[in-house]
């Protein structure tokens, strides 16, 4: 399928056999921008710097919390691990879920005493960041401070988030909370104001699979006394937000750690990487187009009947 899409989208880039659908026409424009490697090289890191400087300029925990909703609506990093997806008990209804922050290492087991792979992977991650962050004008002292704080917070986080094995036990993850009870777990976060600005109302309930995170870690993490740690994670998140869109050197460098984890020896060719990046916001439209092109009406009817 990937080779087919490379062929088809290559034709679209050359102005051949262009789709009539307006959404797909926007995909063609977006893909053309993402695949303009000369323009990406010329721009360097300039497109990333406004976000990085905005995050650097945050002056306090109160300043941070006052901008949570604005960051959420703009797709900027804000360390708010919430999502909307179907209710386990009623798949026809979408509900709010309270997840957890992500770990650096692949699973909590890598943080256990005696695990030799954990420190090895963490060293690879840190080395990658020490090469990557200078590209965004972070000084050597800033980089050390950010990485020291992020790694320390990550080690503490690992004590409270679910392991991969625990996450697989779906029947044990359904913990509904009344909204008032949930927001009381993190009293320093203005969650009522956050959700009112983001969705126009406060939720009435929330499903919390990551109870340990919210009960034992989040109250300490989301606090004014922990601002320096939060700020470090935000600055790192701001830098990483742009890596797939910038120069080829940065794209390849930013994938070193993930390639180590997955055992992939070489980075993907830039043409394939650009297509994958462009496909993300248009996946549904492209899927419908592919089905219409490759499935006969009879095959479509057969699938619909089975569903």
Question: Each predicted region: which residue ranges?
Answer:
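Noncatalytic, helix-rich "gating/capping" subdomain that lines the substrate-entry/channel surface
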Residues: 12-307
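Charge-dense polyanion-binding interfaces
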Residues: 7, 11
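N-terminal mature-domain "stem" immediately C-terminal to a signal peptide or N-terminal signal-anchor/transmembrane
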Residues: 1-6
